[in-house]
């Protein structure tokens, strides 16, 4: 389905420069777009591609349009302060228009406990299990093999992709999106040591601590594939509104993730950690337990966080990749830092002594 630039501007805002009757029916990169496709410029370093693109129209920021000057003549634009966000909204609209509607109802192979409540407008796919006391909200969609435990609530307009497991006593707010393989509400990693003796004579066991809290997920949260969020030991693990979590992320028990925070893939967050609002956690970041990150904290990829970071800012502890030989030389220097320190101290001591002798003379 194609829409005019006028129709897009009426829905999403922005100023049209050029022919508002130009129709676009899809999105494409600047260097690949055709005359019935809409492209966007989010990074000024690609400004030259706007001059050569075959796109029917381009989403562009006001300052970048000014830089084009005469090269903008004869082209069509929607001018907006944030072309990237505009692109995202248009893309979602095109997906919604193209998606075949799913008929409400329960697939015959699904298992719904009589004590569960499933909205008449919900879509329940094949082999879904919904246990007693669970509540499935209006227009929620549960794809094949989803499991919803007892007493769990799934908010209106939420979408659980195939093979998602939501354990008992959890809450998902409205418009939640949970991708395949995610597990929400599994037991937190809680064990009490009960050992006596030392060495080979040591006996005892790790005693499992029952995890009796739940997981509370706020509205408009998206959780990536194969991500796991543990239930709290006593209180709930909390994911606040509009948090976006990538694939393969581990969030330990009793954590609290503040609103609008984003967490990239393979990050691991140990239990009882609090992350503030509008934070950005890079890929493969490791965060120790019982620490607090303040609002607007950014932790770059592969960094390790071992203490609280209360102040907003960018934090890095990862070592960027270098050529193998350079790494070996650096590693050798690191191994000998203690010796270098001792030599410097000895030289400083000798220098002070020499200066003292010279002064006395």
UniProtKB/Swiss-Prot annotation:
Its EC number is 2.3.1.191. One of its GO terms (cellular component) is membrane. Pfam families: Hexapep (PF00132), Hexapep_2 (PF14602), LpxD (PF04613). The active site is at residue 253. Coiled coil: none annotated. InterPro entries: Hexapep, Hexapep_transf_CS, LpxD, Trimer_LpxA-like_sf, UDP_GlcNAc_AcTrfase_non-rep. Disulfide bonds: none annotated. GO terms for biological process: lipid A biosynthetic process. Pathway: Bacterial outer membrane biogenesis; LPS lipid A biosynthesis. Keywords: Acyltransferase, Lipid A biosynthesis, Lipid biosynthesis, Lipid metabolism, Repeat, Transferase. It catalyses: a UDP-3-O-[(3R)-3-hydroxyacyl]-alpha-D-glucosamine + a (3R)-hydroxyacyl-[ACP] = a UDP-2-N,3-O-bis[(3R)-3-hydroxyacyl]-alpha-D-glucosamine + holo-[ACP] + H(+). One of its GO terms (molecular function) is N-acyltransferase activity. Catalyzes the N-acylation of UDP-3-O-acylglucosamine using 3-hydroxyacyl-ACP as the acyl donor. Is involved in the biosynthesis of lipid A, a phosphorylated glycolipid that anchors the lipopolysaccharide to the outer membrane of the cell. Belongs to the transferase hexapeptide repeat family. LpxD subfamily. Homotrimer. This is UDP-3-O-acylglucosamine N-acyltransferase. It comes from Burkholderia mallei (strain ATCC 23344). The gene is lpxD.
